[in-house]
């Protein structure tokens, strides 16, 4: 599914339009609310589609530039969806508790990741085998905890170019850290959330798994397109670089012939 082919009916069937109870609404979501039904706000899906297109195009450009997009979803109903699709894209993701300072104290987080790598080296170089049973158990537990919380960002060597969160209110710490560093924030925002708290707000039901699946799957397709563009550009650049030495060598081979003619 691409930006220009968003099917409103599919969004409707996925329950993307269901908001929260009217008494829990955030006034700044008013432009995205279509109506009230049985005490629940109904989101305008045409506006959802427009915001999906806007966010998708921006994420595509970020992916095409070679920068990473970190996906954040610690809510139970979003974890599996996000981890699966982010893994397919080769993008970092956080689906367990957000580690405080994940972005604002990235150097320390990187040290924790390096600790995980150090433990792995201990197992391969034989050091691990020299430890006592108790020490081995402690190290194994440390490794498991690090893998659970930071395993998906092990390959991150620098801050992401953007973050995407399933629920801006639920992931407010991640959103706050990103803002402090000027990192763009993409987010699904329900009717109880301030849409101006993020850079790219997608008004949608952020509680139902089908709704989350529909939005994240669309963004996945956009990012994959961006990655394909980058790969194509790189292949073209490599091809030109390979041709350059040949083009430079050709005149040099013809030079002796010119000298022979002069003689």
Question: What does each model-found stretch correspond to?
Answer:
Residues 70, 164-165, 186:
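Structural motif
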Residues 187-193, 262-263:
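Compositionally biased, low-hydrophobicity segments enriched in charged and small polar residues
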Residues 2-147, 153, 157, 171, ...:
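Acidic-enriched and Gly/Ser
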Residues 1-5, 225-263:
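Intrinsically disordered, compositionally biased charged tails
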């Amino acid at each position: 599914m691409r930006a220009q082919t968003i099917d409103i009916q599919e969004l409707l069937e996925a329950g993307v339009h269901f908001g929260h109870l009217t008494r829990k609404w955030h006034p700044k979501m008013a432009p995205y609310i279509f109506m009230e039904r049985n005490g629940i706000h109904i989101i305008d899906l045409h506006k959802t589609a427009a915001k999906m297109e806007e966010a998708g195009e921006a994420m595509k450009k970020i992916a095409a530039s070679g920068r990473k997009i970190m996906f954040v979803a610690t809510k139970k109903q979003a974890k599996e969806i996000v981890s699966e699709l982010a893994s397919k894209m080769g993008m970092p993701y956080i689906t367990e508790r957000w580690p405080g300072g994940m972005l604002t104290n990235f150097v320390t987080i990187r040290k924790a990741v390096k600790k995980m790598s150090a433990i792995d080296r201990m197992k391969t170089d034989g050091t691990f085998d020299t430890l006592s049973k108790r020490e081995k158990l402690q190290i194994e537990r440390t490794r498991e905890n690090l893998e659970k919380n930071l395993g998906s960002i092990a390959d991150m060597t620098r801050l992401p170019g953007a973050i995407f969160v399933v629920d801006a209110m639920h992931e407010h710490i991640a959103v706050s850290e990103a803002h402090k560093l000027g990192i763009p924030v993409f987010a699904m925002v329900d009717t109880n959330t301030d849409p101006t708290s993020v850079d790219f707000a997608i008004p949608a039901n952020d509680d139902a798994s089908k709704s989350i699946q529909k939005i994240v799957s669309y963004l996945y397709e956009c990012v994959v397109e961006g990655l394909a563009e980058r790969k194509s550009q790189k292949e073209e650049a490599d091809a030109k670089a390979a041709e350059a030495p040949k083009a430079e060598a050709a005149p040099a081979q013809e030079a002796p012939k010119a000298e022979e003619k002069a003689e």
